[in-house]
From Swiss-Prot:
The UniProt record lists the keyword Magnesium: yes
NCBIfam families from the UniProt entry: gal_kin (TIGR00131), PRK00555.1 (NF001816)
Described purpose of this protein according to its UniProt entry: Catalyzes the transfer of the gamma-phosphate of ATP to D-galactose to form alpha-D-galactose-1-phosphate (Gal-1-P).
Protein name as annotated: Galactokinase
UniProt record similarity statement: Belongs to the GHMP kinase family. GalK subfamily.
Organism lineage: Bacteria, Bacillati, Actinomycetota, Actinomycetes, Mycobacteriales
PANTHER family per record: GALACTOKINASE-RELATED, MEVALONATE KINASE/GALACTOKINASE
GO MF entry, a single one: galactokinase activity
Annotated metabolic or biological route of this protein: Carbohydrate metabolism; galactose metabolism
Enzyme Commission number(s) of this protein: 2.7.1.6
Catalytic activity entry: alpha-D-galactose + ATP = alpha-D-galactose 1-phosphate + ADP + H(+)
Entry GO CC: cytosol
Family matches, as PROSITE patterns: GALACTOKINASE
Amino acid sequence: MTVSYGAPGRVNLIGEHTDYNLGFALPIALPRRTVVTFTPEHTGAITARSDRADGSARIPLDTTPGQVTGWAAYAAGAIWALRGAGHPVPGGAMSITSDVEIGSGLSSSAALIGAVLGAVGAATGTRIDRLERARLAQRAENDYVGAPTGLLDHLAALFGAPKTALLIDFRDITVRPVAFDPDACDVVLLLMDSRARHCHAGGEYALRRASCERAAADLGVSSLRAVQDRGLAALGAIADPIDARRARHVLTENQRVLDFAAALADSDFTAAGQLLTASHESMREDFAITTERIDLIAESAVRAGALGARMTGGGFGGAVIALVPADRARDVADTVRRAAVTAGYDEPAVSRTYAAPGAAECR
């Protein structure tokens, strides 16, 4: 039986590098999706093809980390995680199509892993709840691919819903829906892809995580979330000033997530926009994960009339989001494109986006 299963990319509205620190984040699922079509066969491997790559990749069912590389490593990681958890995985043919841009900060990797997990589960009739699937996906990305990411991307892809943001508490692993419908207030969410690609399997992401872990160790706690209620004064016990700056971002970002959710409850997109900009400034000054190109896009959007703008995703490239009054959206988009080209960068791809459904079988 052939099955098709789709999983979305995501935009993290606010709450960057907070997930592995057991803090808060507020993502939405995107209308852009990765779809995996899987036909089980009596073979000892899965042959995978992607519309993003030439040729095919052979994934042995007994694959181990490091055996499959490149784009296919994410699919192989999903297979490895499923089998490691005792779930059945048959051989077969797998076809992958996607309109989630790779390296744009929209979590193309989580969309691919989630779609593979869903397709194999649907083909075998295996019922796996969403939280377990998120943990399997994280294990695939952490331990097979080698990207030290948290649960954010996978929870967003699995729990996403139309006109809904997800307030995630990573200490308790709870997901609370928060109404997110800016169009109802004549505000649009602009997604501005810088076309500067990034990769979480690279070293900078891991360095930020290690810095946060050192800061927590200096404070005598297992995660920075444990000192959230103590305020910034607690950071004086952190030995390394760079580690202290990283921790300051995490604590202030957690509060911004909660304040952003409160602003949404009041339909106060002016306040929400200001929090986006404050988040970007914190990522630039304290966490040092933005780039000159990304900063230019965010700052140009605000100067042109956006209520606020910030980089979304793990950093070092990718995309910027902005909340913009609907009647200013075209001017903001034109200004951002012009500013980037004038500075010698590729023209950003600017589009309106919205909160969309999460992962599901394609019927």
